[in-house]
Structures are given as structure tokens and as C-alpha cells.
């Protein structure tokens, strides 16, 4: 057991030696006035002790009698007032690492995180995903299914560095969790299955990391599996991701004879004995059969890194190789600037390769001071740019990136602190809404467990309790120095189902549950369809909505009936159309009059909706134009064909006229609605449907059946590929409407031996016969 591996003994010199999991640590002797460290974890200046007073627990703060007298102007906390005494750092900001672990589903993210927590002393036993005991997979649904559903945060320490880790899901239905984690992280570990190589969701998370400019290192995992091939995976990183890999390790053996790795920086072999759960390893000479290969990859590494320093380059050309410290400095520089991506390898499940991975996080990924400062805007004037540097003395600025409901604490708001500091009991400004919020408690999270802290400093990832109006993507700032940071983009749902409680008594409980779940997950929407008298929930896939319904049952005690899944279609136009519409009403008293000419233009896919005013000479007074805008925007949620949202359309207000007495904002709003109905019908309306990229991995003997089935689902086969073990890979595009219950069909067709992944590729035009069916259904409902 891991707990048995802790031994404290006295050496001959009289000093204490702490042996944790096979590695010796010499604790720092502190004066008695300091709190002792536990298992090498440094104390945090902001941590509250168990003996905290009740007022401290509730989030208030006491100011000693010896302090200067309070100003009588305001007796409310500022962002900094209560934080000053607690603002001393236990770990310098340059030694912080805020990282995420991202990959395709089943690449080993959570398993790797569990090993990291064990070897750093954060956990004292290893949790396993397949046993449902992984610390980071704390939800019941995660433990039952063996997958990560929600991103989980924790903090640990390695080599005097503080590492804040977010473990993210790999399933495409939960890609939002990856998106918002990457938005607030400084670096990432991208895992790859050494057998499967680069998989579809690997490409998705890689693009997300590119979007936010996140430096990353690659870890080729599962080197112990049958068919493991480090070098093929390295080649796929080049061809599939367009990355420039920098190989820092090569494996010693593979599959069941995988023993360790060759460290190309030190030019030593690192070998794990298998004792003490992988905590024990040794540095040895490189095996003879790998010496030539190691020299070859070492030379390739040197050629890449010496380009970053002219002096080192000159010395290298003269035959002088850089020392280890210089190599690490240059690898770090190239990683942070995105010149290349370091690649390491190992087997997290077999406890091999994790400690060098932790060293690489410390050595090569950036601290908060090494990433560009955060740019924001003035809430009063978005044209003014405000820069927030990563410094405790800067005004506080943080981004809320996740909301979580806690049964004991209530709503928790996860915040990345980009500058300044905050304390429990202080006030912050929600800069997006202009509302002040009071922080009840500050909590440092470890999966779903929590620890009260008194202050959060720059670089921290912290949970705030007590916020009522803040949602994901909003900025919290110092009330005296407001700033709005860039918001996050959230994907639109692609699937929906009708849901209703089994008993009328649960109607209110279901509404409460849906509201809380929608606050947590911006990719989940719900609405009430009054015509059909039913509630509709929308999400990113069948699994996503299945989890939502399951959470309603477990967390909110609501038993629900769920209808068949429905696709979220879109409507658009295919040509330019211009319409003149006059709204005129006279029924005694003041009448209504508005006359407008609107041109509707199709836009490129993904452009959304745009409004443009081309009014000249006051044909439509400026005060009435917002009425036209509002009228058109309201109509964009309900198209003319089947009532689906309208996308990729520009509406231009070209001309119009008004009446001095009878015209009003409302009249122009009603005219805009009429112009929309007429204009859309003239502009060649068409329906769009979500097209999914579907990758099927199947034994070769079932390949024909799989292809035939995909073709019958209106699928388009893009390419074929091979995988070890006689497996074939089919890459295709299939409409989402044809993919419901596909997993059951695939299992039956291949005797359970095939698997598939699916992710949104694009929206495309619906065939006319299907469009006619959808339109007729809408007309039947309307009738």
C-alpha cells in the first residue's frame, strides 16, 4: 500500500530523512512558530487552519486593534483590504504552472492525473478509472461509465513548484469543458494512445489549444499495449496536426517488454523496476542496441534548439555541444514560443514515465509571468484597451470559467486570477453586468473536496462561494478599476429532446434543476414550447443529454419521461432579395405607420446574422432604426420553412419613410417582422442540417457491412486507413439525423468488435424531399 511507503527515520548525522514511496525527501526544519509541512507539501500562506473562528469560516475578516483606524467614508471591504496580511506567497509566481491534460477519449488522461497526484504526495493511494476509484472522476456517472464528464481541478507540488491541474473530458459531447479549461490555462499536456495515434478528438483539442495559443508538451501513453508504436505516433503528430515535434525521449522496448525511456537531454536511460508502484526508478547507461538511435534523435533535437540562440549555434557548429542547463533553457524557449512541441513517452497505467513528465512540466511549460499579459476593455468604452499584468500589486482581474453546484456550499464559481488578489469577505465587480458581488468563501478545490483559504493571489485557480449573478465567461474585477476580459465562445447545441416530469408534483423541481444545470453548462439549453406544451432540452449529443437526464434524477430527485431525439436544423437563404413593406394601422386615435425597404443577402457558412443600415438623408429617423433591428432579430429565431433558427444572413435597411405623428419604434418593429416574412420567402429559403464526421474502427471482415450501412444513412465515405491488429478505419461524413441509435446497429453488425467516434463537421443543405417532410410537419403542428 502507498500509505505503508512513508517512513521517517533519523540519519547518523542526526537529521531526519522522509522516505515517501521510495524517494527520499529531507524536510526543511522550521521554527516552532511555523506550521509543519506534511509529506513535502509546502504550506500555503492563505490556508485557513482547522481552528479558524466562525466569522472567518463564514467569510468575514477581523481587523486587529493595532491596525490604523478605519476611514469613516466607507465601511465595506475593498478587493485588497482584507488580503494584505495574507498576501505573502508560499511559492513565487515564476514557480506556478497552470496546466490542463487533454486528449481523445480513453487515451489515459485521468489515469495520468492519478499518478501525478500520487507521486507528488497529493494522494496516498492510486485511484483507477476502471475500478471507479479515480479521485478526479468524482461524479457517480463518471465512476459508472469510466469516462470523464466534467473538468476537475486540483493543486499539487513538484520540485518546489505549485502545479494547478485541470483534467478534461475526451468525449466529443463534452468538448466545451476542454474549451473553457484551455481559455484559463498557461500550458497543457496532450496525451496520445501509442496504439491509436492521433485520433479525431485529439485533432479537436489540438485546434482548441492553437486557438488560445497554449504551449503544450506531448506524452505518448500506453507504451505497454499490444501494437504500441511511439515513432508512428510521432509521424502522425506531424501529418495530422501539422506540428513540429521535438523528441526528448525514445522508448526502451514496447508492448510487454517496455522498461523505460532514454532521456535525450541527459543521454541516460531511465528504468523503472516495478517496485513501490513506480516510485522507484534509476538512471543507467543507454542500452547498446539503442545507442545509435539515441544519437540520431539527439542530433535532430540539437539542430532544432540551437537555432534559437546565435551564440549556442556558433559553438555547436564548432563542435561544442551545449550543457544540460542550456539545452533545457532552449527547449523551454522553443516550447513557450510555439517553435516546436516536446514529445515524451511512457505508460501511466504501468507507472512508468510520469516523473519525467512532471519534470518536463516544470522545465518547459510557462509560468503566468511568461505568457502575454491579459488584454481587456473598458466596460464604459470598448474601444479602450486595458492591460492586466500578472502581478499581485495590479488591480484584481479574474475570469469565471466554470459554475458548479455543491450540495454543501451551494453554487461555486471557478475563477482564474490574472492579476491582483482577493480575500474572503471582499467585494468584486462583475464587469459585464456592472453588479457588485460579495465573496462569501474562497475555496481551493481538489476534485470535489475543498479547503477554505483566506486569500487568492495572481495565478491561482480558485472557487468562490456566494456569487449570485456571475455566469461562465464573465469578468470579475476590482470595483475601482473595472475591466472586461475577452469572453469565451460556446458551441450551439445540435440535438434536442422533449422532456416532462412523471408526476405534476415534480414540475417545479425539474425547472429548478434545469436552471442550475444550464448555469453550469453553457452548451446545454432548455426552453418551453407552449404550442406543444412541453419542455425541450438541447445539447451536444445523445450522451450529453443522457447525462443531463441522469443528473436530474440523482441530484434533483426528478423522474422524467424523455422523447425521441430531434435534430437542431437551421434555416438560411440562397440568393439576394429586396422587399418593401409598409405597416399601416388606423383604428381611432393615434395610428401606426412604418415603411421600410430591406435587402436580405446570404453570407458564408458560420457567419451568423448581421444587420446593416444604409439609410441616407434621414429617410428613417435614427431613433426608429433600433425598432427595425429588434424586429428582425426576434424573427431570426423562427424561420419561414419549419420554424428553425435562421443563420448566415445579412439584413440591410435600404430605405423607408415615416409619419410625423403615427410612426413609432413599435411600428417599425412590426414592419421589420413583415419584411422578414416576405423577404425570406423571396430569397430562396433552404434548410441546413448538422453533418457529423464519423470515424469507424472495425475488423476487416465487417468492413463491407459498415460501408454499406453508412451509405444507407446518406453517408459520404472520405477515406480508409489501417490500424494494428487487422483493423480498418473508415472516415466519413454523415447527417446527424441518420446517426441516432447507431451504436446498437454497429454492435449488432460487428458482434461488438467495432467502435466509432463522432463530432460536428459542418452544416449543409438538407435534400429537398426531407426539407418538404420537415416543412409539412411544422404546418401540421401549426394547424
Curated annotation (Swiss-Prot):
Under the GO molecular function aspect, what terms does this record hold? ATP binding; GTP binding; GTPase activity; mRNA binding; translation elongation factor activity
UniProt keywords, alphabetically: Chloroplast, Elongation factor, GTP-binding, Nucleotide-binding, Plastid, Protein biosynthesis, Transit peptide
Cellular compartments annotated: Plastid, Chloroplast
Q: Is GTP-binding among the key words of this record?
A: yes
The biological pathway it contributes to is: Protein biosynthesis; polypeptide chain elongation
Q: Which InterPro entries match?
A: EF_G_plantC (IPR030848), EFG_II (IPR041095), EFG_III (IPR009022), EFG_III/V (IPR035647), EFG_IV (IPR047872), EFG_V (IPR035649), EFG_V-like (IPR000640), EFTu-like_2 (IPR004161)
Residues that span the membrane, as ranges: none
* PROSITE patterns, per database record: G_TR_1 (PS00301), G_TR_2 (PS51722)
Could you state one GO cellular component term attached to this entry? mitochondrion
Tissue expr: Expressed in cotyledons and at lower levels in adult leaves.
Q: Where does GTP bind?
A: 103-110, 167-171, 221-224
Tell me, according to the record, the phenotype of the null mutant.
Answer: Embryo lethality.
Query: Transit peptide: which residues?
Result: 1-80
Pfam families from the entry? Answer: EFG_C, EFG_III, EFG_IV, GTP_EFTU, GTP_EFTU_D2
SMART domains, A to Z: EFG_C, EFG_IV
Q: Which domain of life is it from?
A: Eukaryota
Residue ranges of domain tr-type G in the record: 94-369
Nucleotide-binding as UniProt keyword: yes
Family, per entry: Belongs to the TRAFAC class translation factor GTPase superfamily. Classic translation factor GTPase family. EF-G/EF-2 subfamily.
Q: Which HAMAP family match?
A: EF_G_EF_2_B (MF_00054_B), EF_G_plantC (MF_03063)
Q: Please give the function described in this protein's UniProt entry.
A: Chloroplast-localized elongation factor EF-G involved in protein synthesis in plastids. Catalyzes the GTP-dependent ribosomal translocation step during translation elongation. During this step, the ribosome changes from the pre-translocational (PRE) to the post-translocational (POST) state as the newly formed A-site-bound peptidyl-tRNA and P-site-bound deacylated tRNA move to the P and E sites, respectively. Catalyzes the coordinated movement of the two tRNA molecules, the mRNA and conformational changes in the ribosome.
Give the protein name, as stated in the record: Elongation factor G, chloroplastic
